[in-house]
């Protein structure tokens, strides 16, 4: 093994071990914060602080889950649980989950469906839901009020293609080659404290596990368009 490869392997093993060790204390802190917040005698200031603790613990818990997921992918210990998926149902469920969130933020979320029935997609439904969720979450986070986000699916040559399009801040050309790298954070206009640069990396890993691919392009008028290809 080359020195660089050895260093990367050591880093991956450390992240995996550290992530496992963080789960228990995080759970204890979160449980303690919930107990404290249930005290009816708490002052408004104390309630505010416990709410912050709860929020930050949940954020850290999400990071730990993402790190563990990537560690499992690295170790090839996370097999896909493929089933036959009804694409129409998946699209409708995804729309119903995110439309209220978009509406609350003043964003129009549109779902385009085909009049023709989609072929059955053989994939891991939980991972597919996670892939779409990451893209839509990103689209919401980087979209402006009164803008639009759209989700649709089409059938190409032996491929099912999901398209997520937003009219938000977009991604600079200089950042595009790196957006799927671990811990990469783009320019300040696309940097938020809730994100650690793992979401798109996770989508890439999960899509490639399905032998698919992702394409990124600019939305006409500004924003991003992601196309996710799954083999049929």
Question: Residue spans of the language-model regions?
Answer:
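Short alpha-helical segment of the dimerization/phosphotransfer core of two-component systems
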Residues: 55-60
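Short conserved segments within the C-terminal catalytic ATPase subdomain
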Residues: 101-112
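Conserved glycine-rich
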Residues: 211-212
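Short helix-loop "hinge" at the ATP-lid/N-box region of the Bergerat-fold HATPase_c
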Residues: 139-140
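Short conserved segment of the HATPase_c
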Residues: 171-183
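Conserved micro-motifs of the catalytic ATP-binding
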Residues: 75-80, 118-123
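A conserved beta-strand-to-alpha-helix junction within the catalytic ATP-binding
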Residues: 81-99
């Amino acid at each position: 093994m080359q020195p660089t490869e050895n260093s990367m392997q050591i880093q991956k093993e450390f992240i995996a071990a550290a992530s496992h060790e963080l789960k228990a204390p995080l759970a204890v802190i979160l449980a303690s914060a919930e107990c404290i917040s249930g005290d009816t005698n708490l002052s408004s200031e104390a309630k505010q602080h416990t709410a912050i603790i709860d929020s930050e613990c949940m954020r850290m818990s999400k990071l730990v889950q993402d790190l563990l997921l990537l560690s499992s992918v690295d170790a090839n210990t996370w097999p896909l649980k493929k089933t036959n998926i009804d694409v129409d149902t998946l699209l409708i469920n995804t729309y119903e989950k995110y439309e209220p969130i978009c509406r609350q933020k003043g964003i129009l979320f549109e779902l385009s469906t085909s009049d023709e029935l989609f072929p059955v997609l053989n994939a891991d439904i939980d991972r597919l839901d996670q892939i779409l969720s990451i893209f839509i979450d990103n689209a919401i986070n980087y979209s402006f009020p009164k803008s639009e986000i759209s989700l649709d699916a089409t059938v190409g040559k032996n491929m099912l293609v999901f398209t997520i399009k937003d009219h938000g801040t977009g991604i600079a050309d200089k950042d595009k080659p790196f957006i799927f790298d671990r811990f990469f954070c783009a320019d300040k206009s696309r940097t938020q404290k809730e994100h650690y640069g793992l979401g798109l990396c996770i989508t890439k890993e999960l899509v490639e596990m399905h032998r698919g691919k992702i394409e990124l392009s600019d939305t006409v008028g500004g924003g991003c368009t992601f196309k996710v290809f799954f083999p049929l």
